[in-house]
């Protein structure tokens, strides 16, 4: 293994190698080792990249760690992957130690799928679970008809003229959330640029014309939205990508209505394809959001996997 080296920029070839590394790990483990945001960051200079290369003439990537900076009260976050053929050589441990040294022990680590090797590495280094993100799934068969309350308008995304209201509702609904809160126009633009983006899969719930005088430019006010996603690399899999309801509009059943509208749309769009297997939908929810977990269970979802964030319990003592 070569020396661990931090980079603020990856070449096109290094980005390709990291993507190949992620693909190799996913095929063996059955779960992606890093989130989609990490893949978006490969071409950017907003995060730090730790690349471990083998000693072959081509210097192929056998280990990678992405470190996103801290934002306000939210800790810096690391996500890492080691090539299946290069495991049990101390590469993951070396990368974790390098990240802890860089942040003074104050960053967290995502372990997607909470696999046994990740648990063992965390335990050996004194890392403890601080957050759990539950992935839930259900079949897209036998979906009930959504009940649309009186005075509610449902339409799909019309373009950038909807962005201001989308950001307002998103940032109000997820004010507490490390990844989903605080979005800007740039965040929306990045996702519109993704190959999977389909405006017909972004549903908006707006109040009737009687509330229009209270909204910008006299247009109906956005109460909530459901952004769906079809996974292009996993035929037959859809996702509740973002489901947000304005806190001022909660208690009206909008979340359930929007969920079912989006699921029926996913079922129709995926049903148009010759998949050879049953279509499925997934979503992520914080494990401590008991109300949301129970709501999704009531809609037929069950736990598929759990992602765990680890951190040092006492950074100063551990690194002293």
UniProtKB/Swiss-Prot annotation:
GO MF annotation list: mycothiol synthase activity; protein-N-terminal-alanine acetyltransferase activity
Catalytic activity: 1D-myo-inositol 2-(L-cysteinylamino)-2-deoxy-alpha-D-glucopyranoside + acetyl-CoA = mycothiol + CoA + H(+)
Enzyme Commission number(s) of this protein: 2.3.1.189
Keyword Repeat on entry: yes
Domain N-acetyltransferase: 16-141, 152-320
Binding site for acetyl-CoA 1: 80-82, 88-93
Pfam families, per the entry: Acetyltransf_1 (PF00583)
Function, in words: Catalyzes the transfer of acetyl from acetyl-CoA to desacetylmycothiol (Cys-GlcN-Ins) to form mycothiol.
The name this protein goes by in its record: Mycothiol acetyltransferase
